[in-house]
Amino acid sequence: MIYKTFQNDLSLCLGSADTALCLPPLAYVSDKVFKYENENFLNKGWVPTGRADRLSEIGDYETLDVSGHPVILIRGNDNQLNALANSCRHRGARLLEGNGNTKGIRCPFHSWLYRIDGSFAAAPRIETSDAFLERNNDLIHYKLEERLGFLFISLEEKPGAIDKWLGNFAELHGDWPISGMKTTRKWTREFPFNWKCFLDVFNEYYHLPFVHRDSIDAVYHTPRAGDLSTGNFATQFGKTDGTGGLLESQQNYAFGNMPGLRGDALLGARYTWMFPTMTFACSNDAMWVYEARPKDERTCIVTQSTCFHPSTIAQKNFKEVSKIYYERMDTALDEDII
């Protein structure tokens, strides 16, 4: 009965912006809802996984879990990024942890060795086994695409075309030079709440006068209505007084406009939710990105990335002033986590 009521409540979320209700509470605490989300949102289609530039050198890797599947993102000798299953083909042992740079991937359990493109290289005591050598022992590859500097992974063997999935994403973000922006700081933390809670809060202005009254509220004007999206994302633009990348008391430290800005990008910030698990904001001088990967129905793993244009990074005072931008990111987040 409770889930029949939930389905009815969920249908009330499908109206216009003036009439639609918020997601029902069960969407944030139910293990059954979480299982459905995994099966239909994370195991199917494309899942955004942050910025590609963080893996810039051959052998750079990063590990993550996508819907319970352990994954390695790694740059191969051909300078292409690959998404590999982070489990040995022998007994399924986890191969790598965290992030770093490597010339090969060695299983810690039986020392099976793989090249950084995922192909099998060697294993102890297999020289006499013709049957073994004839098998495909390469690591499983997942589909991986890059658009505007963002990475998208799919666990499906034959996912739909990424550009169809994105729709008019590039068009609506064309006023900013997003593709060339570089990640200068990144951290990951675990939080004790549902992944959608985090993404909900980042994408609404309603709480600003109450939660961010003395930090960033005065920077932001009431945003425009959301733009018409033809892809798997929602986005809206709002004017700002100064930059959304700094606290209202620190606006005098602003880097100034990035090169190549036009239109809306000169006037404020665009906030975008890339379904299902990534959101970001782009102002005239910086971009900040959050990934909220679900661990279970009551826990999520959040990664924050702060990005700047290369010309900004080249400024002599970048190291000092960028810390003031990072302070704004952390202050606003700490205020949100109440």
Regions found by a protein language model. Give the residues of each.
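Generic structural signal for secondary-structure transition and capping sites
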Residues: L42-W46, A93, H207
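Short Pro/Gly-enriched beta-strand edge/turn motifs at strand-loop
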Residues: N43-R54, A123-T128, Y271-P276
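C-terminal catalytic domain of Rieske-type non-heme iron oxygenases
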Residues: I74-R75, Q80, N86, E145, ...
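Active-site region of the double-stranded beta-helix
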Residues: N38-E39, V47-L64, A254
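N-terminal short leaders/motifs
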Residues: I2-D31, A93-R106, D138-E146, I216, ...
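Rieske [2Fe-2S] iron-sulfur-binding domain
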Residues: R54-E157, D163-E171
